[in-house]
């Protein structure tokens, strides 16, 4: 589904300053967003096509070959030239589909933050070992590791897509802020009407860092927020950020009183009876209650 979004009104000072360098943004066509969201088998992960008049940038690349092919179809149907793919997170559901996308658009650059690219390279053998047998022909045969993005901006037809989060602990979690249309896309921090992936955030410090990232998004006052994972039909606005913040707080409270993972699962289901992702909730509960070992990426101490 396409999401036309209005152009940001610039302040007088900013407009005057910009006019000496190039035409004001008001004279440019606003960028357009189109979200592709996978089904539950791929954790409802999102990819977002950001389009200008003739060119486009893709944020995140899907998990399975099937979803990647559907994503390619969306890009082709848009009629835009795909210039670049940015991978915002180092989990397989964000990059396994790169192989299919590269085959369809070989001239499009594929990039990620330095920390994300390094994590993908280091963890790829284990990820293939785990997911290869489960995905079979639906998984990558020649997975692609992104190149390192130079700087913290992606340019699309004179408009800036800012990669935010590179100044955090290791630059592992990032999202894309598009100020001209006040939109946040990419990243794994925002969930919409879905149980949060807490397996990688099994300490109070990690959850606090997560909450800080969400408040950073909130402070930008975006009008559009595309959750990295969301139940189909979930809103794409700040309500997803507030949902995620509330969930983290509720999770911490339930975790502190739950005797075991079953009690934690039941408590969160009572609190969020309509949330998708029961498998995600169950895995996180086992990890957080110490019933299952999980090699998490630690970015906060």
Task: Describe the function of each predicted region.
Residues 27-77, 175-188:
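Conserved beta-strand hairpin/beta-sheet module of binuclear metal-dependent hydrolase folds
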Residues 63-64, 119-250:
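Metallo-beta-lactamase
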Residues 1-7:
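Positively charged n-region of N-terminal signal peptides that target proteins for export
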Residues 66-111:
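Active-site metal-binding motif and surrounding structural segment of the metallo-beta-lactamase
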Residues 219-224, 232-301:
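Accessory terminal helices/loops
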Residues 21-23:
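N-terminal signal peptide c-region/cleavage motif recognized by signal peptidases
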Residues 9-19:
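Bacterial N-terminal signal peptides
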